[in-house]
Regions:
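FAD-dinucleotide binding site
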Residues: 1-155
Length: 155
């Protein structure tokens, strides 16, 4: 699926198979695709679909990214037995911070697209995570080699 995919394509990608295999991930979210917000929303949607399918037994969630963790959290809240499997030695999927030169650096999703009606903003607040307002007036732009660029180059 390429950039700019339609909502219909995203809905099709999210369709369950045989009532047993459910899909989540930011690419399946029609309102916030390509965002962490969309990943979380897709996990919540998949969890609701799984619960509505009313199939007995434990549920396996493949992937401990935001979509998988969101689905697992909601399914657990529904009282379901959930096992999350992850291929990496860490959770979070594309949301990842590391230390570079003694300073924390975000290597994945790190920006909330709006605070109003964004469940990630609520989650950040509940975890006492500081949020910093984006100041577009004072933003800097750099090329792939780290050299400063003028914004006019983007026009």
């Amino acid at each position: 699926m390429g950039p700019g995919a339609s909502s219909a394509t995203r809905r099709m990608l999210a369709l369950p198979i045989d009532g047993h295999l459910f899909f989540a991930g930011e690419a399946t979210d029609t309102e916030h695709p390509a965002t962490v917000h969309g990943a979380l929303a897709s996990g919540q949607r998949a969890a609701a679909e799984i619960q509505a399918a009313d199939k007995p037994g434990p549920i396996v969630v493949i992937g401990a990214g935001v979509a998988g963790l969101g689905a697992a959290r909601d399914l657990t809240a529904f009282g379901r037995e959930v096992v999350v499997v992850e291929s990496r030695q860490r959770i979070g999927g594309r949301v990842w911070s590391d230390t570079v030169g003694g300073a924390p650096v975000d290597l994945g999703g790190s920006w909330l697209h709006g605070l109003r009606d964004n469940p990630l903003a609520d989650l950040a607040a509940s975890l006492d995570i500081d949020l910093v307002h984006t100041d577009y007036e004072d933003a800097a732009l750099f090329d792939a080699d780290g050299r400063p660029m003028e914004w006019a180059h983007l026009d």
